[in-house]
A protein has these predicted regions:
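Short, charged/polar micro-motifs that form catalytic or ligand-binding hotspots
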Residues: 11-14, 18, 139-146, 221-225
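Short helix-capping/linker segments at secondary-structure and domain boundaries
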Residues: 33, 133-139, 240-249
Length: 297
């Protein structure tokens, strides 16, 4: 028996990259009939970003929660923790962790300097806290960029007589500009937000999505494209084309030159807009349910 835990640092609007571990968490919850905790770390984003206010990050937390709920979670077995609102529950656990994590360790892991505020130095203790909110093991699906925090959590857990959290790294959806960087909420041109209109999605994909195709049609027909670096294909592979046979056909057609970059982008645009049309309606419906999901200390 175990429970699930994942989360989000609310520094901006939700983009499609954020949804990957949440959708996977939903699949795990349905498969194993487990309880789920979703942590919104409004405090961490306030500490880490110079121009961020608590008012802003708290507002983003509630907006991000709507996207999480819209994926189909149920309030009876899913609770949303907001750090600044649920500190009464989190702090006693975080205090146990903080006592067993020294500054030299966090400095080595995160590169902290003398100028780093003490909120950031303490933060790993708060991100660890939901791992032990239930008296049973926890499974955490998350973006690999959060791995350093949970490695420390795993190191400290036995020292407070708790089981080490089990971790599942989720793949990162690349930014529109290229497959090497992850999608970021702070770069509007390289990000597809869950609130984007069909027109905006089409414009962003056509204008900014990095292509693995050739410079002109003639050369593309002759040499074919490279789906391994083509962002549109990677979005289909990671999230938007669940049918493996269809995905393989798109891969082969693009690689052979039969399918052009523009045609590949059209497939992606249609699939993203179809997904977002449904998601945005569910997101609005979630407003009336939000209070049922919020964790009560």
């Amino acid at each position: 028996k175990f429970f699930l835990y994942t989360g989000r640092g609310p520094s901006g609007h939700t983009h499609i990259g954020h949804l990957v571990p949440w959708v996977f968490a939903k699949w795990l919850q349905d498969k194993f009939k487990t309880k789920m905790y979703f942590q919104l770390t409004d405090d961490e984003k306030f500490w880490s970003k110079k121009d961020m206010t608590l008012e802003k990050t708290s507002k983003f937390a509630l907006e991000n929660a709507l996207d999480f709920i819209a994926l189909g979670f149920k309030p009876e077995n899913t609770k949303i923790i907001i750090d600044t609102k649920n500190i009464k529950t989190l702090y006693p656990i975080a205090a146990q962790f903080a006592k067993r994590i020294n500054f030299s360790n966090t400095k080595a892991v995160f590169g902290f300097e003398n100028e780093t505020n003490i909120g950031m130095i303490f933060y790993t203790s708060l991100q660890s806290a939901p791992c032990f909110i239930e008296d049973m093991p926890v499974l955490i699906p998350f973006g690999v960029d959060q791995d350093p925090h949970f490695r420390i959590t795993r190191d400290v857990a036995p020292k407070i007589n708790k089981p080490k959290p089990a971790l599942i790294h989720n793949i990162m959806i690349p930014a529109l500009g290229g497959p090497k960087g992850k999608m970021s909420a702070s770069n509007e041109n390289e990000t597809i937000y869950t609130t984007d209109s069909p027109e905006v999605v089409k414009k962003k994909i056509n204008k900014y999505a990095f292509s693995g195709g050739q410079p002109d049609i003639e050369e593309h027909r002759k040499k074919g494209g490279n789906p391994d670096i083509d962002v549109s294909f990677q979005y289909l592979r990671i999230f938007f084309e669940p049918d493996d046979k269809k995905l393989q056909q798109i891969h082969d057609d693009y690689k052979s030159g039969k399918m052009l970059t523009g045609e590949l982008k059209e497939i992606l645009i249609e699939k993203i807009n179809k997904f977002l049309a449904i998601h945005q309606q569910k997101r609005e419906d979630a407003r009336s349910q939000l209070d049922e999901f919020l964790f009560k200390d």
